Design a protein with these regions (language model features):
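Outer-membrane beta-barrel signature, preferentially recognizing the C-terminal barrel domain
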Residues: 283-307, 341-343, 432, 452, ...
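Short acidic/polar hinge/loop motifs at secondary-structure boundaries
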Residues: 129, 148-175, 193-196
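Short strand-turn segments of transmembrane beta-barrel domains in outer membranes
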Residues: 190, 195-223, 233-246
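Extracytoplasmic beta-strand/coil segments of soluble accessory domains associated
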Residues: 107, 111-147
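Gram-negative outer-membrane beta-barrel transporters
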Residues: 413, 417-419, 509-511, 531-619, ...
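Short loop/turn motifs that connect adjacent beta-strands in outer-membrane beta-barrel proteins
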Residues: 82, 197-202, 226-228, 262-263, ...
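Flexible loop and strand-edge segments within Gram-negative outer membrane beta-barrel domains
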Residues: 54, 239-246, 250, 264-345
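Short, acidic, small-residue-rich periplasmic hinge/interaction motif at the N-terminus
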Residues: 53-99, 137, 304-306
Length: 685
């Protein structure tokens, strides 16, 4: 029997009355709390309220456990709508599951979601290409506390974020085109990372070490008063690499602050991310000695007024630096120097939401400016500029574009029926064209108390990245005449939710045109960016989550069982091209999770992942292309053991327990079995 289960009084919090016959018996001999739901705004949109019953085990500070209905606010529309009425699949990964998972980065964590394709190039969060439902890594919006940090240079760097895993309160994954919610970059979906705020005076640390000279130190301090809360965190990680030239070093600094008053609430955040890593065969297997050095600075401020009409303004700024070395050492005679890139993004948005007798209406506007300076990307500059933070190098080229988006959405909420209609009106200065409209409609109908049927239709767009447009190198060539990608998507699904079981199944079809991809006709050719005629996705995904303890036996050793599966079929007209990204999609993915207690504070979490990728890659031998090799399916097993006592948590984890050989991207082997161990400690002051 778990120590905490036998010595801690269990508190049950009721936030919903379901009139079940057994409800009274489940409350016997327990402390009962009555909870009230509150809502706040994420992004410039108001979120929907997600309710999911979940057992909360003792946290690492040793405070009392509670069994309650988990209430999470997620951004699934521009106006607030309850989750049981929402018409999108939103995957929420809370802090408790993050702490229990055998991962070292956000990219690792997203591997366990069935609908997400994570293609790692290196470990420790160095670089990964992340896509949703058969899209590409450039087709998702990446947000930090509602601020869009998608990188206009390339999606390779969108996850250069200044936060540690211990900073994260939850991660929200919105599946499917969401341009009318998040703007043009949410072509295939969006990932919103929500960080913890300073709600109490606490100091915490999280540290670990492992094979391949891996180690990391994290520390955070929270401070709170009646109306003011803030959190400051820092983290540093390093590894010697699992094979030659896969070493890395990474630094994160992050500050977040909240100010609450009767009239309005305000949020501020700032961060810095610094990475340097060996990039063995990242972009071409002909050059295994590549290296990448990146920096990102980030600032934002926002607020939310109280009253009948809620205004949510936000301003933000981010600057990203990248030094890419084709030769980390011993360069070839023809090599003229490294590539230097600097992207700067700043923007402002305003959203207004009100509820009246005909429903809830939300409208807003966003301005976003994206610029690049480089010695490779863009148009020739009049005067060269020295590269900041570097001893050598000059910017010779640049480009800039502005995007203005107008949003309008209305929700009709009836007892069993929900209707949401909205439109994005988008103008981009690089297109020299009129405003383009991207509408969408979502509808759902509740069947009985626990089942909801839903359907949606949405249009979306994505602008080419600066890399798509301008990059030229030994193995790649951009195309300045690229058109924006456009798509039309349909989705139908069924959701089933009870206090112990949550399940959904969704079928989707996305019809795309002018899809951008890096392609070549023969293995010996270089990659060129082109608008493919069409790339259409047809598929479905399903998920089932079971909480056995909610059936009545709160001492049952199994805490959670979760199963997920996603299937995609891609119909493409590539005219015989070899594809680098879009055409080697993840066809099958199965995930399983088991979380259970062991004995006296010990618990374990197991993850199983099996996936089968379509397409092939060009196999290299002796640094030269040899033949096309189909991607082989593989299975991975990861596990983590935790021991908790009061404010201390000790843990050990094993990744790739079966020591499988596998590739996410061609010619870049992924790590074999990897052991790590560490501890977390926190205390109030």
């Amino acid at each position: 029997m778990n120590y905490w289960e036998s010595h801690t009084q269990v508190a049950v919090r009721f936030r919903r009355f379901d009139r079940k016959r057994y409800a009274a018996f489940r409350s016997m001999h327990k402390v009962i709390n009555i909870g009230v739901v509150t809502a706040s705004t994420l992004l410039f949109a108001l979120p929907d309220t997600a309710q999911a019953q979940k057992v909360i085990e003792p946290n690492r500070t040793g405070e009392e456990a509670s069994v309650e209905l988990e209430e999470v606010e997620v951004t699934a529309s521009r106006a607030p709508i309850a989750r049981n009425q929402a018409t999108k699949i939103v995957t929420v990964i809370p802090a408790r599951e993050i702490a229990a998972a055998p991962v070292t980065s956000i990219q690792d964590l997203l591997e366990y979601a069935a609908g997400i394709d994570v293609r790692q190039r290196g470990e420790g969060g160095t670089q990964a290409d992340i896509s949703i439902r058969g899209g590409t890594f450039d087709q998702i919006a990446v947000l930090l506390n509602g601020v869009n940090l998608s990188n206009p240079q390339t999606g390779h760097y969108s996850f250069d974020l200044p936060v540690n895993l211990s900073d994260i309160e939850r991660i929200e994954v919105v599946s499917g085109p969401s341009s009318r919610i998040f703007g043009a970059s949410a072509f295939a979906g969006a990932i919103n990372i929500i960080t913890k705020t300073g709600k109490e005076n606490r100091i915490s640390t999280d540290n670990y070490a492992g094979m391949h000279k891996l180690w990391k130190l994290e520390a955070a301090i929270n401070h709170a008063t009646t109306h003011f809360g803030q959190r400051l965190s820092a983290g540093y990680a390093s590894s010697g690499g699992y094979i030659d030239n896969t070493d890395f070093k990474q630094l994160n600094l992050f500050w977040q602050s909240e100010l609450k008053s009767e009239e309005a609430d305000f949020q501020f955040q700032a961060g810095y991310n610094d990475k340097g890593y060996g990039a063995n065969s990242f972009y071409s297997a002909s050059y295994p000695n590549q290296y990448d050095k990146t920096r990102r600075f980030f600032l934002s401020a926002g607020g939310e007024t109280h009253g009948k009409i809620k205004f949510t303004p936000k301003v933000y700024w981010t600057r990203h630096f990248d030094r890419y070395e084709l030769f980390r050492s011993d360069p070839a005679d023809w090599y003229t120097g490294h590539n230097y890139h600097e992207t700067e993004v700043f923007g402002a948005n305003l959203n207004a939401t009100t509820q009246w007798k005909l429903g809830r209406t939300s409208m807003g506007v966003e301005f976003r400016n994206e610029g690049v300076k480089s010695n490779v990307l863009g148009k020739p500059m009049k005067e060269p500029q020295d590269v900041p933070f570097e001893k050598e190098g000059q910017y010779l080229k640049s480009d800039n574009r502005s995007n203005i988006s107008y949003f309008l959405e209305h929700n009709v909420l009836l007892r069993r029926f929900t209707l949401s209609v909205g439109v994005l009106a988008n103008y981009n200065s690089a297109l020299n064209e009129r405003i383009h409209f991207y509408p969408g409609i979502d509808a759902s109908y509740r069947i009985g108390d626990n089942v909801r049927l839903y359907g949606s239709w949405n249009r979306a767009l994505r602008m080419p990245t600066f890399t798509d447009l301008y990059y030229e190198g030994k193995t790649n060539k951009g195309n300045p005449d690229l058109k924006p990608e456009e798509s039309e998507a349909f989705e139908v699904g069924l959701k089933y939710n009870t206090y112990f079981l949550r399940a959904h199944i969704a079928g989707f079809y996305r019809k795309g045109k002018n899809m951008i991809d890096w392609v070549k006709e023969k293995p010996e050719d270089i990659w060129e960016s082109q608008n493919l005629t069409k790339v259409d996705n047809l598929g479905f995904e399903t998920n089932l989550s079971l909480l056995p303890r909610e059936l009545g036996n709160e001492r049952f050793f199994i805490r959670k069982i979760e199963l997920g599966y996603a299937f995609i079929h891609q119909d493409k007209d590539s005219e015989g091209y070899i594809s680098d990204y879009a055409l080697d999609y993840l066809k099958h993915k199965f995930t399983a999770q088991l979380s259970h207690s062991i004995w006296k504070g010990f618990s374990a979490t197991w993850y199983v992942r099996w996936q089968d990728r379509a397409g092939s890659y060009t196999k290299y031998e002796n640094l030269k292309p040899a033949y096309e090799e189909p991607y082989a399916p593989y299975c991975l097993v990861d596990m983590k053991v935790n021991w908790e006592y009061q404010r201390l948590n000790l843990y050990a984890e094993l990744n790739n327990l079966l020591n499988s050989t596998y590739y996410d991207l061609g010619n870049i082997p992924q790590p074999g079995i990897w052991f790590k161990a560490g501890f977390r400690y926190s205390f109030k002051y």
